[in-house]
Amino acid sequence: MDFPGAARLLSLLLVPLLLGPARGLRNASQRTFKIDYGHNRFLKDGQPFRYISGSIHYFRVPRFYWKDRLLKMKMAGLNAIQTYVPWNFHEPQPGQYQFSGEHDVEYFLKLAHELGLLVILRPGPYICAEWDMGGLPAWLLLKESIILRSSDPDYLAAVDKWLGVLLPKMKPLLYQNGGPIITVQVENEYGSYFTCDYDYLRFLQRRFRDHLGGDVLLFTTDGAHEKFLQCGALQGIYATVDFGPDANITAAFQIQRKSEPRGPLVNSEFYTGWLDHWGQPHSRVRTEVVASSLHDVLAHGANVNLYMFIGGTNFAYWNGANIPYQPQPTSYDYDAPLSEAGDLTDKYFALRDVIRKFEKVPEGFIPPSTPKFAYGKVALQKLKTVEDALNVLCPAGPIKSLYPLTFIQVKQYFGFVLYRTTLPQDCSNPTPLSSPLNGVRDRAYVAVDGVPQGVLERSYVITLNITGQAGATLDLLVENMGRVNYGRYINDFKGLISNLTLGSSVLTDWMIFPLDTEDAVRSHLGGWHGRNHGRQDNKAFAHHSSNYTLPAFYAGNFSIPSGIPDLPQDTFIQFSGWTKGQVWINGFNLGRYWPGRGPQVTLFVPRHILVTSAPNTIMVLELERAPCDDNGPELCTVEFVDRPLISATPTSSHPLPDLSDRDSGWDRV
């Protein structure tokens, strides 16, 4: 049965079986969802109800696969799903909204409804979720003094406008209006944030009521510690907690009872796995531990949401980071019951067996794991260095400034900015280039007159010895590795946020190039013909040649084999010999690769971005060192394989903090 055709057929057969009567969006009469405080339970249409839900983030799963993943969740015995709504995903620029295609949250929720799944909606405005800036749009930082997640007037004005766009779209999808949404979360784990601003929570409460109506069931979620609920809970909003499988369940729910003496027990985030960071081992939580703890939670009569049921992928630049600065990788597999690629795991079946002891689990076939195909190796050719492609990457030319400007100041919210100045002194002997205030956010790839010098890295490498003559061009290609998504430092400015020094001199007179890699890749695929043999390539290996090459673009293409049915299929791309960079396939930004740091080695390639009618184009931006160069016989290749590798032993030259405890145990996602 492990074929796409079979999966599609099963989906068509299952949908009518899974749909209950009277599930149309217009059948809203007599539909209610309330709390029965006298019996500590929910009531759905007047009947006792308990939800067992799972988290799925539509923004981390291709729309092409939404139905497949939702069906698998339904067949696991879940009666609801939970999802966040990331503000920055839908309003990337002020007043520019995206609600179509991959951003069509309304379609996603209606699809869940069609499949008989209820919805627990978490619209923020802050979501955390290991997502860039916790879902808050970076353009909020244009007001540098803004206090995020507070009653700061500038912040409230932006939030008010956003909620005025989003929530009216959600209102028709509320359960009482015939839709699937049974509860709506206000903010997210606010008790873990430093501001403790009740005026802010009251403002949100009013706006949610204004837009959604007085009968919608609002709730909050906080870690199962008294200190978190002190600032996270608010009268009139039902307080829930979150905790993982290592927690004392009785003690955790006693914390909820201090805020909610009566009402249903709810764990809004029961952790099935945990998040990863570059340079740390892949997180795993043993299946038997999760299954045993879930059994105990359900035996308490509690409602529970499994976070995550499927993690998915941080495509493009969407990953978040923690403090001390530690960005998350492209994969958000989370060791969840469904893998990053949506495959069934032993954990899936173990949790399904637990659920069937308490609730009825649908009978019938479970949609199978999707087949994978190893397309093999693809040769890539070097196109141009970033320096030589500046006319394409930054057609408007540079911004001039006496001192460095941040990404926000040049309105570059993601990706890369090139900072350029000249050496004010002779550096024939190695001279320290320093960021004394740890002002490189987050990595800077340094070159002098086209000769690679090394990398400055936030919190780890703040000084680098460079050489060059007075008047030589100093370039720093600065990469935004993902904004902090949790804690008091989410106002995470990127770029050079403070001055650099060369020896004892402050560097001035900068030319700043915001790089539009997305437009360049989409508009100029195949347009940068020929290999470059200018001064930059001739010198690229004259200094530190064993460690670095200049950041450069490489491209190649491959065709889907003919004569094999049901192609294209999902695959995984790996980068043997490559170091760190970004990859696009047919203009789709897959995300970051960093096998030199680990633990993720392969990137998930969903089949819907591949084509059979023409060659598929791969574009790679290698930032540190490619496995080939202009002066050697090595061939640059990437390889498509049929198995993921996201748990390699990490390698790092820096001591990395263990962030698995963030606050205490499992308090946070």
From Swiss-Prot:
One of its GO terms (cellular component) is vacuole. The active site is at 189 (proton donor), 269 (nucleophile). Belongs to the glycosyl hydrolase 35 family. Residues 649-669 are annotated as: Disordered. Transmembrane segments: none annotated. Residues 659-669 have a biased composition (Basic and acidic residues). Its EC number is 3.2.1.23. Cleaves beta-linked terminal galactosyl residues from gangliosides, glycoproteins, and glycosaminoglycans. It holds the Pfam family BetaGal_gal-bd. Gene3D superfamilies: Galactose-binding domain-like, Glycosidases. This is Beta-galactosidase. It comes from Felis catus. It is found in: Lysosome. Residues 1-24 form the signal peptide. It catalyses: Hydrolysis of terminal non-reducing beta-D-galactose residues in beta-D-galactosides. SUPFAM superfamilies: (Trans)glycosidases, Galactose-binding domain-like. Keywords: Disulfide bond, Glycoprotein, Glycosidase, Hydrolase, Lysosome, Signal, Zymogen. GO terms for biological process: galactose catabolic process. Glycans are attached at residues 27, 248, 465, 499, 547, 557. Substrate binds at residues 84, 130, 188, 334. Homodimer. May form higher multimers. GO terms for molecular function: beta-galactosidase activity. It comes from the Eukaryota. Residues 25-29 form a propeptide. Disulfide bonds join 196-231, 628-636. The lineage of its organism: Eukaryota, Metazoa, Chordata, Craniata, Vertebrata.
